[in-house]
Amino acid sequence: MAIDENKQKALAAALGQIEKQFGKGSIMRLGEDRSMDVETISTGSLSLDIALGAGGLPMGRIVEIYGPESSGKTTLTLQVIAAAQLEGKTCAFIDAEHALDPIYARKLGVDIDNLLCSQPDTGEQALEICDALARSGAVDVIVVDSVAALTPKAEIEGEIGDSHMGLAARMMSQAMRKLAGNLKQSNTLLIFINQIRMKIGVMFGNPETTTGGNALKFYASVRLDIRRIGAVKEGENVVGSETRVKVVKNKIAAPFKQAEFQILYGEGINFYGELVDLGVKEKLIEKAGAWYSYKGEKIGQGKANATAWLKDNPETAKEIEKKVRELLLSNPNSTPDFSVDDSEGVAETNEDF
């Protein structure tokens, strides 16, 4: 429908005045805004990248990863950092828990010599550091480990036993308002790791809650619930964890999908194992009995041998990965069955700890 000529002139004058006052690009038609094309970074897990619908975690946004203890939260964020560094991006790790193991990070592929690391004294200091890094425009990925460890200054200066109702929630709420715009302008990905607490007296529904108030839940573009669902064994020895991640919230694609993968101790996410499974599922890799073949060439007897072959042949692995991504990301209807029936079992966010 054509707009009245006088209205068009008035609109053009108004847009010109806004751009003159606030700068070029302060207002534009949505179709002209090329920054709306979401750039993503791989999570290190192929099935999780596909479950997210965009091929990874979105740049310029806030992401929350939460789950029980020893579920793989920090491992997943370190894999994101490793993937980002491979693309030449600069990463920072805000270690509020004072528990980052550089030796483990190196084993996961993180270049620790070029990883910025801070161990802040207070929650306010941690969030101010995040804001300063985002405003610099020079840092691409920031990880905060964890929201539960972001202790307000008043609580640190007070005594154990003092009541500080809602302090952390107010601190996070103020930080989210300040950070969201700066992250978008600098195209910086900010990942918050969060812990789970139990609500007292819940008779029906899920008693789980995440710490730090409601603001993070609203401002996060992606929320991931990560759980350990089993053990990976070699004979009698436990060598890793079977892990399930649910996409609880997703502003860039359809939510409530899930991915399952293995986290191997000392190695991280078993990417090549996922590649074998998804390759077979999409008929890119042929499986006859225990033998796996690719383009008529046998690559191994048993999944472990096929995985080892792909690890030794990275060019073939990249070729299969590219085909899997093209098949599953270009056509959402062909996505493997990662769906969750509903949002039951998703942790809510409480006002305080």
From Swiss-Prot:
Alphabetical list of Pfam families matching this protein: RecA (PF00154), RecA_C (PF21096)
CDD domains xrefs: RecA
UniProt entry tagged with the keyword Cytoplasm: yes
Keyword list, A-Z: ATP-binding, Cytoplasm, DNA damage, DNA recombination, DNA repair, DNA-binding, Nucleotide-binding, SOS response
Gene3D superfamilies on file: P-loop containing nucleotide triphosphate hydrolases
Main location: cytoplasm
SMART domains associated with the record: AAA
GO cellular component: cytosol
Localisation per UniProt entry: Cytoplasm
Gene Ontology annotations of biological process type: DNA recombination; DNA repair; SOS response
Residues annotated for ATP binding in this entry: 67-74
Entry's Gene Ontology molecular function annotations: ATP binding; ATP hydrolysis activity; ATP-dependent DNA damage sensor activity; damaged DNA binding; single-stranded DNA binding
Family, similarity comment: Belongs to the RecA family.
Function according to Swiss-Prot or TrEMBL: Can catalyze the hydrolysis of ATP in the presence of single-stranded DNA, the ATP-dependent uptake of single-stranded DNA by duplex DNA, and the ATP-dependent hybridization of homologous single-stranded DNAs. It interacts with LexA causing its activation and leading to its autocatalytic cleavage.
Protein name: Protein RecA
Organism: Shigella sonnei
